[in-house]
């Protein structure tokens, strides 16, 4: 298996200074599973001691893949309609995260995969995260069918980053473009199998702007 990750030339009118543009590629000599993503933590306030609770999150997804109490996907694809998983309109991350809802209990908050409506269209944002405090907006684009949103539920103030900064509980958000979790055991889902002669190509763009 040969794998590479590189920033390709800027696409879709984006400049190097306003976007992180990642492309993963892989080829193999034996059938294997490939499902790469980026687990960066985004804090749009520049202050890791602050919670992400007021960040506005939008996800272009009508459904998600629920998890059980062990964080394993159940194999279902469930509508977000009428649930705390509905982010089709801008909603504060913290507005419902502690609600008495089974999925939020299982994930200790948001740590789930959403089934994207973008259907591989990299010119259309699949998710948007915005800080009302700074006006910084992060748009995410991908050719993948899913995105995992992790709200930093297990950040507990014990991790120290650069310049001695402590990362507090839910101080940031991860937006991870991907195939759905556990796809090798869910043959009806988009496959993560890579066979000899095939090429894996996964594209993720994080584009930043400031709302005026």
Question: Which role does the model predict for each range below?
Answer:
Residues 1-212:
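An exposed, glycine/acidic-rich loop-and-rim segment of catalytic or binding clefts
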